């Protein structure tokens, strides 16, 4: 028996050697080459955007210098006086849509902010689209709407008997009401968004004075960025998206993805593009791409910020990232041919949308992060015959990381944590991206991102604090624990048999996977 036990490992080792040289080594070398190629593509894209951003600031290509945006002024001093109704005619009719679904903790935020916008009361309609399934919450929202209506605000509370199309379906149904025909523009805010009173005064002029502009997008500002380390990581990623990606798209091609909220659309442009469609989980990006292909221009206002809330639980954040990664990949699959054959936009804009906007940022950016740093690099430790050039695993990633940090300078000291966290999240983003490209599994899964508002503060007052307890099934993430074990094994192998080049990175990444795997990330909400 002892002899047989000794022979088995030798047989396994012999089989491994027979397979490794002709099969595993060539495949791993091919994987390294593919990852290096994708890394170069990502590197070039980051450098390109940084150069454009520097040019925008150096040459003053701000929206207010490129487009006319004179303030809209009424003839009378008191714009809300019924006797001066004609004076308000200079102000276009604006519809404000607030889609919500069981938003118990935050529904008052957006309703109150929308009703407090500085705009003539007879030239704005607030439309609350309530898809809530909880009757108690529906009643609370309706009561809040009636409260504002009693103050003279033109507010409409709209419900439907199904949730077909989810958010896209609610927005589409909202546009069918008769009173919408009188509106020229529509501003959209999710339930946790709180625009400042001057939001319409700063966005509508771009649309009024520039008939070729379809969309004005504002930047998100996060009220709970300091809640936990996970929200700080999100702030870094989203600040880069807004300060760099959106700014570059707006400045170079007058095109970028609509963020689904904190933006104002020209209704005629929406209708020309085909309106809201629910074929993917990114109805906002879908509409933006279709409108862009019709020749419409978009403007991003980086200095106009709208307060919002980041998901602070890991479960909510993971669902959000699945939707944000799966949707664009699926939309790319559906629209690639349509974009390539479009006749209304220039060749350079088509290349930008296909290559820069979709391929590099929405697909390659997710895949290379996970495959290269969480699969291929550890595998080369186990198979020393395959080497990665230093420029591929040191220089390019370092430069890309530094360029990513320009969005949030205040979090520069968290850069290492951000890299490790993003590598973990790339696992879920890659999985979602492949689901979207292949159109399988959870491709159209829509889960509303949970926002806590002040709920946790109310549940956990300082004087009666109890350690939150969670069910073990809610906390443990088996996939992350599996990768933690894999990376830890590779790190130990590198120290014992390799050159030790990667061991520090592998152990740090393994620890990060483990921490997230056991659920100690984000805000823990007690049951």
Swiss-Prot record:
GO terms for cellular component: Golgi apparatus; Golgi membrane. Keywords: Cell wall biogenesis/degradation, Glycosyltransferase, Golgi apparatus, Membrane, Transferase, Transmembrane, Transmembrane helix. InterPro entries: Glyco_trans_2-like, Nucleotide-diphossugar_trans. One of its GO terms (biological process) is cell wall organization. It is a multi-pass membrane protein. The active site is at 131, 284. Its main location: Golgi. One of its GO terms (molecular function) is glucomannan 4-beta-mannosyltransferase activity. It comes from the Eukaryota. Signal peptide: none annotated. It catalyses: GDP-mannose + (glucomannan)n = GDP + (glucomannan)n+1. This is Probable glucomannan 4-beta-mannosyltransferase 9. The lineage of its organism: Eukaryota, Viridiplantae, Streptophyta, Embryophyta, Tracheophyta.
């Amino acid at each position: 028996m002892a002899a047989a036990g000794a022979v088995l490992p030798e047989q396994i080792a012999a089989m491994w050697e027979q397979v490794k040289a002709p099969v595993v080594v060539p495949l791993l070398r091919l994987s390294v080459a593919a990852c290096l190629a994708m890394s170069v593509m990502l590197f070039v894209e980051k450098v390109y955007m940084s150069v454009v951003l520097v040019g925008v600031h150096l040459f003053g290509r701000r929206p207010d210098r490129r487009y006319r945006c004179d303030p809209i002024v009424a003839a009378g001093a008191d714009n809300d006086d019924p006797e001066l109704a004609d004076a308000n005619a200079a102000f276009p009719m604006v519809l404000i849509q607030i889609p919500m679904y069981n938003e118990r903790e935050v529904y008052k935020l957006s309703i109150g902010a929308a009703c407090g916008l500085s705009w003539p009361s007879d030239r704005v309609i607030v439309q609350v689209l309530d898809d809530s399934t909880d009757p108690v919450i529906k009643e609370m929202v309706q009561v809040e709407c009636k409260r504002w209506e009693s103050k003279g605000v033109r507010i409409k509370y709209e419900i439907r008997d199904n949730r077909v199309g989810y958010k896209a379906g609610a927005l589409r149904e909202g546009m069918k009401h008769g009173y919408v025909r009188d509106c020229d523009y529509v501003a959209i805010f999710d339930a946790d968004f709180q625009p400042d009173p001057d939001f319409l005064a700063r966005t509508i002029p771009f649309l009024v004075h520039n008939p070729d502009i379809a969309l004005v997008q504002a930047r998100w500002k996060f009220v709970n960025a300091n809640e936990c380390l996970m929200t700080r990581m999100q702030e870094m990623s989203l600040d880069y998206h807004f300060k760099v990606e959106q700014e570059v798209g707006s400045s170079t091609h007058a095109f970028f993805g609509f963020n689904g909220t904190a933006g104002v659309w020209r209704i005629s442009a929406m209708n020309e593009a085909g309106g809201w469609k629910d074929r993917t989980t990114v109805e906002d990006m879908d509409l933006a791409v279709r409108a862009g292909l019709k020749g419409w221009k978009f403007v991003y206002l980086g200095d106009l910020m709208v307060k919002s809330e980041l998901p602070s639980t890991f479960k909510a954040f993971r669902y959000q990232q699945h939707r944000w990664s799966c949707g664009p990949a699926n939309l790319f699959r559906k629209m690639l041919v349509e974009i390539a054959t479009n006749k209304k936009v220039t060749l350079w804009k088509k290349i930008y949308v296909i290559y820069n906007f979709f391929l590099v940022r929405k697909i390659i950016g997710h895949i290379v992060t996970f495959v290269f740093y969480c699969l291929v690099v550890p595998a080369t430790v186990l198979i020393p015959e395959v080497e990665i050039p230093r420029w591929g695993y040191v220089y390019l990633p370092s430069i890309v990381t530094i360029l990513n940090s320009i969005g949030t300078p205040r979090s520069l000291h968290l850069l290492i944590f951000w890299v490790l966290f993003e590598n973990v999240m790339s696992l879920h983003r890659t999985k979602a991206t492949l689901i979207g490209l292949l159109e399988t599994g959870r491709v159209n899964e829509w889960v509303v991102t949970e926002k806590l508002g002040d709920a946790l503060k109310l549940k956990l007052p300082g004087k009666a604090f109890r350690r939150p307890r969670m069910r073990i099934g809610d906390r443990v993430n088996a996939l992350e624990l599996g990768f933690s074990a894999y990376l830890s094994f590779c790190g130990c192998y590198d120290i014992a048999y390799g050159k030790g080049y990667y061991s520090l990175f592998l152990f740090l990444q393994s620890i990060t996977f483990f921490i997230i795997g056991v659920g100690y990330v984000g805000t823990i909400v007690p049951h």
